[in-house]
Every structure is written in structure tokens, then in C-alpha cells.
Amino acid sequence: MNTIKTGLLTTLLLACLCMLQAVQAESTITIDSAWIREAPPATSVLAAYMTINNASETDQQITGMDSPDFRSAEIHRTVVEDGVAKMLPVSGLDVAAGGSISLEPGGLHVMLFDPQRPLREGDTATLVVHTASGAAISVQATVVRKTGDDAGHDHSHHHH
């Protein structure tokens, strides 16, 4: 009987420790300047950008993203081969202790597939950033119309 109680107590303690690690990761990872590029209403693929900050003293890994406002979301990296821009999926992002990673046009970004509703300039959508420790950090991204130098990065013509 004591063996069962000890085993149960150990399991409970480990579960609490895992939850504490997830809460710590969530409180040390912050998201700034999240935005989604506005696209024509019939577009099924949009792109999101943001800065991911790690205020902790240990490296953190971003393992993926999703959104209740899209069928799916994937982290991609833009690579130019033979003059053609290609979007390649990235399995995860390492954010150094005390560091940050910028997801921006022409580099790392989030591809958002099949919006649940048309998104116009000024609308917001929820993006969820997942970490290796199990944390899920939600952020509201504002839809922004592309302008100036940024106008040339239209994802509807890139190869995935």
C-alpha cells in the first residue's frame, strides 16, 4: 500500500513540475509586433510576422504555431534559389537566453492556410506559439495592408 501511495505522490509531483516548467516558459517568452499581411479576399494563404523574445536565462525552443482563425499555420523560411523565392518549412526555432528572433518579410515567417473568415485591414486573428516545454502563448495579430518596399513580397506566387 505504501508503494502505491509513494508512486502516486511521485507521479503527482512530476506532473506539477512539468506544469511549472510550462508556466515558466510561457512567462519568459513574449511576442511583440505581431501582424498579418492583408491579402485579396479569395487568397487561401497569408503570412504573419512578429518578434519572439526570450527573457529567461535558458535557451527556449519554439516547436510550432497554430491559430483558431486558420486551418493550419507553419513556420517557414524564405530561400532564394536560381532567382526564385521558395518557402521552406522550419521544424522549430531556437531562441537564445535573453535573445529574440524576428519573423519578417523575406526571412522567417508564419504561413497561415485557409482563413476561417475574410480578414481585412484592421481585423485581428489569434496566433498561438508553442514551446518545447509545453507552453502555448496566444497573441493577437493585426491585419496590415502591405506598403512601400514590403509590397513585393506576395505569397500567392511563391512555391511551397
Give, region by region, the residue ranges found by the protein language model.
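Bacterial N-terminal signal peptides
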Residues: 10-19
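Compact, glycine-rich, soluble single-domain proteins
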Residues: 26-160
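Sec/Tat signal peptide C-region and signal peptidase I cleavage site
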Residues: 20-25
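Positively charged n-region of N-terminal signal peptides that target proteins for export
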Residues: 1-6
